[in-house]
């Protein structure tokens, strides 16, 4: 579960998508099947590593998972089951660290917030996460507002 957790943190994939992720540490990106909500078709996406250096340090090109899929053999039942097992593994460890209510989506949303602080173009970040730019702004609006306030303060308080 460690590889999956580290990969979700570095690339911001949905938990189910992480089972399909193939890192390319040379480019600092990966390929992953995007599993959009609703009845939209799955497609390939190219998540960005935040950061490439950390992906290399954690050796994420040494893939360690018992299950994988691609566009042609996705099993939603198995993927959901393994996602639940993954969460059962993480929750007690998170509590030990003082994080009482960890969900796998928290790891993904952490990537979204870090992408804003890293200055990644919102269009690129939303594609990396596999959602629309509108969804991106809806989810991360408060972070953009915080960054805007900080930047405005820096300009007027030189």
Ranges and model annotations:
Residues 7-8, 101, 114-115, 128, ...:
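Short alpha-helical segment immediately N-terminal to, or the first helix within
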Residues 20-56:
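Conserved tyrosine-mediated DNA breakage-rejoining catalytic core shared by Y-recombinases
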Residues 17-18, 102-103, 112, 120-130:
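Active-site-proximal segment of tyrosine recombinases
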Residues 1-6, 37-38, 78, 145:
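Conserved catalytic core of the tyrosine transesterase superfamily
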Residues 25-30, 120-139:
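Short, polar N-cap/turn motifs at the start of nucleic acid-interacting alpha helices
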Residues 1-15, 19, 108:
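Basic, Lys/Arg- and aromatic-enriched nucleic-acid-binding interface segment
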Residues 47-100, 105-107, 111:
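Active-site/catalytic core of tyrosine-dependent DNA strand-transfer enzymes
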Residues 35-39, 129-153:
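Catalytic-site neighborhood detector that most strongly recognizes the C-terminal catalytic loop/helix
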């Amino acid at each position: 579960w460690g590889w999956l957790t580290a990969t979700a943190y570095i690339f911001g994939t949905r938990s189910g998508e992480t089972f399909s992720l193939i890192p390319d540490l040379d480019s600092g990106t990966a390929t992953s099947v995007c599993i959009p909500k609703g009845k939209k078709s799955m497609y390939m996406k190219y998540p960005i590593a935040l950061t490439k250096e950390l992906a290399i340090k954690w050796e994420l090109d040494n893939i360690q998972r018992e299950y994988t899929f691609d566009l042609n053999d996705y099993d939603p039942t198995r993927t959901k089951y393994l996602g639940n097992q993954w969460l059962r593994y993480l929750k007690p460890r998170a509590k030990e660290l003082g994080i009482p209510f960890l969900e796998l989506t928290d790891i993904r949303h952490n990537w979204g917030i870090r992408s804003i602080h890293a200055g990644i173009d919102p269009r690129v970040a939303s594609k990396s996460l596999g959602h629309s730019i509108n969804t991106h702004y809806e989810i991360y609006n408060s972070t953009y507002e915080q960054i805007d306030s900080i930047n405005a303060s820096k300009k007027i308080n030189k």
